[in-house]
């Protein structure tokens, strides 16, 4: 009798432990991560893991099954955005993308996705609408090798923006290749990379000016094209090239003025300011000679006569 009671108690304990472990495994796990972006704003990322959904996805076949990923985040203006994406296990491409936000914007998109399992080429296009009502299209092309984990990868990302109330230009970034080992003293951008700021960090003009002064009469200014800096990084096997524009400030400025004052004209030497032409020839008369020109001539003749008379005497 005692033995039967002990066996019954042991079985009850095992059943309770199994039910408790099942309840723990079935519990939904939520992970909250708070990071600071390059603009200095706090960004909260919430990841929800549901074991029941994972178990249901694991029971399906790898060729026809789907799994769903949910991302919830809060941007720097306080808008909560939830992105739900359904991925096909056969092609590992998204089939449906749904985005919702706290401002009431909801978009469900079926992306255009093609794949070639023989060559391992995947193409995915996702179109969504942000909180401002602007339609954004993201196209990604990448390669994947099932035999080598360190295969080369190429990435082509283009983003186009269009809306009824605004217009903007289209920017395209394309890169192909792999990272090159850094052998100098600078940090390797593939492992130590700082994100460029999303907005301007200075009020200086992007254009650089050159001022040229010729003598004291002609001054003109020319402009040069903006200077761009390219940074290449490798993330998860994809090579990404980022372009940014920078402005450099100089602490001092040097000015050189060429103004010659002496020059040679072959038969003689010209002194004074080069390039100045006088409108008339002028003569300067000194010692008040202009008023006593006749007296000057009489004095000269009288001096000559006295000299001849003294010679005869």
UniProtKB/Swiss-Prot annotation:
It is a lipid-anchor; GPI-anchor. Its main location: membrane. Residues 72-141 are annotated as: 2 X approximate repeats. Residues 1-26 form the signal peptide. Residues 94-114, 147-198 are annotated as: Disordered. InterPro entries: Kre1 (IPR031452). The keyword Glycoprotein applies. Belongs to the KRE1 family. A lipid is attached at residue 288 (GPI-anchor amidated asparagine). Residues 289-313 form a propeptide. Extensively modified; probably through addition of O-linked mannose residues. This is Protein KRE1. It comes from the Eukaryota. GO terms for cellular component: extracellular region; fungal-type cell wall; fungal-type vacuole; plasma membrane; side of membrane. Present with 623 molecules/cell in log phase SD medium. Keywords: Cell membrane, Cell wall, Cell wall biogenesis/degradation, Glycoprotein, GPI-anchor, Lipoprotein, Membrane, Repeat, Secreted, Signal.
């Amino acid at each position: 009798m005692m033995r039967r009671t002990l066996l019954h108690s042991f079985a009850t304990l095992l059943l309770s432990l199994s039910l408790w472990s099942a309840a723990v495994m079935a519990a939904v796990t939520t992970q909250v991560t708070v990071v600071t972006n390059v603009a200095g704003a706090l960004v909260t990322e919430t990841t929800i893991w549901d074991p029941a959904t994972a178990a249901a996805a694991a029971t399906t076949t790898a060729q026809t099954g789907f799994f769903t990923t949910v991302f919830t985040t809060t941007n720097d203006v306080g808008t909560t955005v939830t992105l739900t994406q359904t991925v096909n296990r056969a092609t590992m491409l998204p089939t449906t993308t749904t985005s919702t936000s706290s401002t009431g914007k909801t978009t469900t998109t079926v992306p255009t996705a093609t794949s070639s399992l023989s060559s391992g080429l995947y193409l995915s296009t996702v179109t969504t609408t942000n909180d401002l009502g602007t339609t954004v299209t993201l196209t990604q092309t990448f390669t994947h090798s099932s035999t080598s984990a360190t295969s080369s990868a190429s990435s082509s990302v283009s983003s186009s923006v269009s809306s009824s109330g605004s217009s903007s230009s289209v920017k395209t970034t394309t890169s192909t290749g792999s990272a090159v080992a850094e052998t100098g003293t600078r940090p390797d951008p593939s492992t130590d990379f700082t994100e460029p700021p999303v907005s301007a960090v200075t009020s200086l003009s992007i254009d650089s000016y050159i001022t040229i002064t010729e003598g004291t009469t002609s001054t003109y200014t020319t402009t040069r094209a903006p200077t761009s800096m390219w940074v290449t990084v490798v993330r998860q096997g994809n090579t990404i090239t980022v372009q940014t524009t920078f402005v450099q400030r100089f602490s001092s400025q040097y000015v050189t003025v060429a103004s010659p004052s002496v020059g040679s004209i072959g038969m003689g030497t010209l002194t004074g300011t080069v390039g100045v032409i006088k409108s008339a020839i002028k003569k300067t008369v000194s010692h008040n000679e202009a008023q006593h020109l006749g007296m000057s001539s009489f004095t000269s003749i009288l001096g000559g006569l006295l000299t001849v008379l003294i010679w005869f005497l």
